[in-house]
Amino acid sequence: MMKAVVDIETDALNATKIHCIVAQHYQTGETRQWIKDECVQFGGWSGKIDQFIMHNGLSFDGPILNRLANAKIQPGQIRDTLIESQLYNPVRDGGHSLESWGERLEYTKGELTEFEEYSEDMLQYCVRDTELTRKLATNLEQEGKGFNPQAYELERNIRIIIDRQQANGFAFNLMEGQILLAKLEDEQHQLESQATEMFEPTEVQLKTKVKYIPFNIASRKQIAERLMERGWEPKRYTDKGNIIINEDVLSQIKDMPEAKMFNRYFLLQKRTGLLKSWIQECQEDGRVHGKVLTLRTITGRMAHHKPNMAQVPAVYSPYGKECRSLWTVSNPETHKLVGTDASGLELRCLAHYLNDTDFTNEILTGDVHSANQVAAGLRTRDQAKTFIYAFLYGAGPAKIGKIVGGSAQTGRKLIEKFLSNMPQLKKLRSNIQEAVEKKGTIKGLDGRRLQIRSEH
């Protein structure tokens, strides 16, 4: 198999031209270069290559070479060292950039600041990147031993789909979004004025005068101080000893209308923050092209930014329906927006590993959450649903206890009762803990190794 390490330099991330291309034979290190107008000749040469080794090649180099250098590189031909780096250890100190890898491998990248025009320095910079990518690929081959190749194939295919999703974007009703933002900001301003009238400014005695600091409804510190002045006794603190003020804490203060006002303000803060991020990222095509990092967490879950389109409020939450209605289709006459959801994915995977006939039947034909309600001794089905997902994702006794309005001791008893009624789950949990103690990793669903940083 003919393998080549390839790197390119372009005029911009959204490239209109390729300044230079450097390719290095993976086994022998033999190097070829194309500069300026020669770059279109790369396409003919690339037809001889079976595998292209590139850093971010799926999302950047490969598509640009196909578009501007007459290449016909297929995604299956690309070995992307960026995806490998993220897959083998999603949370590396320093990240996954080629620059970071240069420091780890003691083969630092070159420095270049001007990319608009070709230069000899640019070519040498590209050569250096190609050599570094070759060293990185060799290093990752060793690191990836024991990983199921299907894990890489899965992440490669996901990256291809996500790149298409980002390019297409999601239609956004900009006008309605601006109207909703104005409405919520208006209520915010009203609450700010109301709070200023309700709470006197704080007096600060200076050397020669008294300074008056107006009450700031957005300051959690000031909120805590004013509530305590009215007799509230805080019960929750941060590790540094600061009083915790959030929507959960405020919702539990039933005898002070001020707490309800503060809670409302925090809600509006969150909603206006989301709306501003959506509006800011809406492009001229009327669509939001949100970014997705496909391998951002230790478990391989995705992360979203610019904006975070995975955090649109649920339809049943305050202003959830209004927020969700902003995400639409470009032409309602020809297209419809269809929502889908997978049913109980985590519990179906759990059933596979438990191999418990009764549990499997509850998922397929019964009501697994009602069954879990009985097993854990919970009051409601909703509590059981919240409990099982929190438990599966590592919630400890304190978090579990909070679900039912109790303490860490309550949570500990709930877990013990649930496991006593689910012996197969107790056994599975014990086996996983033993495996982690021995290896420090566990095997993922697709054969990848998941590094465990803490017991939960």
Question: Where are each of the predicted segments found?
Answer:
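Cytochrome P450 catalytic domain signature, combining two hallmark sequence patches
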Residues: 72-75, 189, 232-238, 354-366
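Generic long, charged, amphipathic alpha-helical segments
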Residues: 366-379, 448-456
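Short active-site loop/helix that positions an aromatic residue
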Residues: 21, 58-71, 86-88, 224-231, ...
